[in-house]
Amino acid sequence: IAPSLVGSEMCIRDSNIGDNLSVDCMIDVDRRNNIKVNHTATHLLHQSLKDVLGDHVNQAGSLVHPEYLRFDITHPNKISSKELESIELIVNQKIDEDITVETSIKSLEEAKKEGATALFGEKYGDQVRVVTMGEFSKELCGGTHVSSTGKINKFKIKHDKAISSGIRRINAVTHNQVDLYLEQKSEELGLQKEVEQKKTEEKQSQSILLN
């Protein structure tokens, strides 16, 4: 498929498709918009990781889901809480700046000269699609994105973990999913406090009975 075209794969169920038929193709708009948000956030996360951890960071895997994003990177060490906070802060700063997201078709050579990030080991054609977010991020990418970073609204890293030697996985959420995640964490914390309070009360009761 040429860089300027988008291909879609369909699965036909319980229907016979013949020649010369006219069909209407529709997308789930809400699902697509959520994917756009998380995909653009992934680009911001990628560059923020490089800024905080170093240029050795490369993408080793990625999943853009309507409800969350998952990003695997090359990094030999555990990412500290302070580093995660810095990464999260940078992403949210770029969201607040509401940077315009621009796409363009360029030659692979021109894109590389401009410093566009490419996936290691990926095979590209002579013409590539470049997604640019101001001076902050420039990547070769054929995916769908929001028109500006402000549409992401907010960004929160849920956790990171090692999945193999030298590879770490980061899970994060954006937009309304951030509020849902924080509410869930608050409820879990409240339940934990209740359990601890009951344990304390039981110990106090046992102490009184023994005395």
Regions found by a protein language model. Name each.
Residues 56, 152-154, 158-211:
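Terminal appendage regions of diverse proteins
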Residues 44-52, 86-97, 173, 177:
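Generic, well-ordered alpha-helical scaffold segments in large soluble proteins
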Residues 15-16, 162:
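Glycine-rich, small/acidic residue-mixed loop/short-helix segments
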